């Protein structure tokens, strides 16, 4: 446990940052919800393309399988075919291929990793090419 003065200070920061949004933020949120929404179709289309490219490239890698995402901008590929658990896989992937992924153990599933496709198509393609090369050398 933290010393009492530190715990109180952290509690105050947490309280102020997660409750009672300021009035200007509330007005901005209302405008975002009620304002023009035409940009959403463009973003949905772009993220759908990114998701499909990442999904296809992941499933083309021997030892990795992935189901298609239903929301957010993450994929959760199964890496059990590589013979490694998620933390070791992610550590080595970062060190050897310079690709960051989140170990699935943090989400309750040690045979999976989480990757984001909230980046450019170029970055997605480059990262997944590096991931494929990394897995091929295992």
Please place each PLM-identified region on the residue numbering.
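PLP-dependent class I/II
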Residues: 1-138
């Amino acid at each position: 446990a933290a010393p009492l003065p530190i715990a109180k200070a952290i509690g105050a920061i947490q309280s102020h940052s997660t409750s009672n949004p300021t009035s200007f933020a509330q007005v901005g949120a209302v405008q975002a919800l009620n304002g023009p929404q035409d940009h959403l179709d463009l973003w949905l289309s772009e993220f759908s393309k990114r998701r499909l490219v990442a999904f296809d490239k992941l499933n083309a890698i021997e030892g990795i399988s992935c189901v298609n995402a239903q929301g957010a901008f993450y994929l959760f590929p199964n890496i059990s075919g590589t013979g490694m658990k998620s933390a070791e896989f992610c550590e080595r992937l970062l060190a050897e291929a310079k690709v960051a992924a989140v170990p699935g153990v943090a989400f309750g599933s040690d045979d999976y990793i989480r990757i984001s496709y909230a980046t450019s198509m170029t970055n997605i393609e480059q990262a997944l090419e590096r991931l494929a090369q990394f897995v091929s050398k295992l």
